[in-house]
Regions:
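N-terminal propeptides
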Residues: 1-214, 218, 222
């Protein structure tokens, strides 16, 4: 509860700081703002956005931009997930969520390789799965089909990376943020299925903050 409240306060501070920025800066930082509010980025990560996006970080962002963002703290530890992911890994709960929902997969040797970097086409595939698309049924072959579909949905907006290039943490955050305003596999704006409002092509941060505040208020206080 304390961690969630601190995340809420951080999100409020970030949102307030946006009020004094020019419109162009607000737009470019909307993804980071929303990801921070939802717990997809730590304060440290938000200050190191030029670092390469890793698979562990991608799992955390995917979970933050999903309906499972509020359930991770209640899952607890369930033993070793992969040969290189212990239960006490900071990414363990997010990796488990991402794999169980089919957004990501491990490797045939029993590893997950959480520190491996993520390319544009890999991130696009993850985002498409998050949106409920069956990537195996897309017309064409990998990665052309995935990149084409991602472009059609607007997932690659404001991302200048090309096929085969490793994404930065900022680019990965932007790509998954773009998924919020895209149409999911059922033809709905994805953000609306999470209870968020969309205005002028961006997620209304006030609806995100309201969601977080309601969660905080509804949580019972633990006895000391």
């Amino acid at each position: 509860m304390k961690k969630r409240f601190l995340a809420f306060l951080l999100a409020v501070c970030v949102a307030v700081s946006m009020l004094v920025l020019p419109a162009s800066a607000v737009g470019s930082n909307a993804a980071v703002q929303t990801a921070t509010a939802l717990g997809g980025l730590t304060a440290e990560q938000a200050g190191s956005l030029g670092a390469p996006l890793t698979r562990g970080q991608a799992a955390r962002l995917l979970t933050a931009f999903s309906a499972y963002r509020d359930t991770t703290t209640a899952q607890g530890r369930t033993g070793r997930l992969y040969s290189d992911v212990d239960s006490d890994s900071p990414y363990a709960v997010y990796i488990r969520t991402a794999v169980q929902n089919g957004w990501m997969t491990g490797y045939s040797d029993g590893s997950f390789r959480p520190d491996n970097t993520v390319t544009l086409e890999e991130a696009c595939t993850m985002a498409l799965r998050l949106l409920g698309y069956d990537v195996a049924k897309l017309g064409g072959t990998f990665p052309t089909a995935q990149l084409s579909k991602a472009s059609a949905l607007g997932l690659r907006n404001e991302i200048n990376a090309r096929q085969g290039e490793t994404l930065t943490l900022e680019q990965g955050t932007m790509l998954f943020y773009n998924a919020l305003t895209a149409m999911n596999g059922s033809g709905q704006v994805y953000a609306s299925t999470l209870g968020f409002a969309v205005s002028n092509g961006q997620v209304d941060i006030s609806s995100v903050l309201l969601d977080l505040s309601l969660i905080h208020i509804s949580e019972p206080t633990r006895p000391r």
